[in-house]
Amino acid sequence: GHTNSWGYMTLSFFAPNRKYAYDKSLGGPTREFQQMVAAFHEAGLEIYLDVVYNHTAEGGNWGGDPNTVGFTSLGGFAAAEYYVMTASHALVDGATGTSNQLNYSSPVAQQLVLDSLEHWTAEMGVDGFRFDLATVLGRKPNDADREDWDNQKRFFTDHPLLTAIAEFAEEKHIEVIAEAWDLWGYEVGNFPQGWAEWNGRYRDAVRRFAKGDGNTIEFLEVVNGDHDNFADNGGPQKTINFIDAHDGFNMADLVSYQEKNNNQPY
């Protein structure tokens, strides 16, 4: 089978992956990470950590003995406290597609994130964070019936966790960047002040313009700051403009076709 090297199935919010370390002794991966950050800082480079707080590597009891469940992350401690659940107490994959969406109605789950950010900032020395599917951190599952999916999907700009993270960033002089969408919604421009946001509108408009799609007005709007979408919660200085990322095709492929063909082999 294929090896999962993507890095988006978080097992622990506090530990670097031992597989990437040369020194695999007790504490070795942590020491190496700290040394790496120090070396980058000495060269004048900041380090931003891509963090996945929307789900964990928690699995289920499928694909094996149905009477046996393996706990790999938070499920063995207090699954009902950390995870969104259906009325029948099954894990939810709605916003993440991973069957283990975290529940940020829970103060315990909120504190876990804040403690993790403190650890990576104070102990490991990173300069900022990019939050994968950050909209999950702005939802309040417990404010709706467990089967009321319309209300489950609501996003709260003033969510206490989003506000606390922005305050933490200001206090520690670090940057926090949201991937401001998930499978339940697109919230670019809606994060509170103190957050920067990946701008998917900029990405899409520039890609289309480069291909000659004729979207000149849209292109000019995003290149000039996307003011219409960022005016309310901090202004266009919040937008993180990008064209390509780890998800999807590389930049050369993006401008080398006329019609999409996702079935073509690599």
PLM region spans:
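Substrate-binding/active-site clefts of carbohydrate-active enzymes
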Residues: 1-125, 130-165
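Conserved alpha/beta catalytic core and glycan-binding cleft of carbohydrate-active enzymes
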Residues: 142, 147-152, 156-266
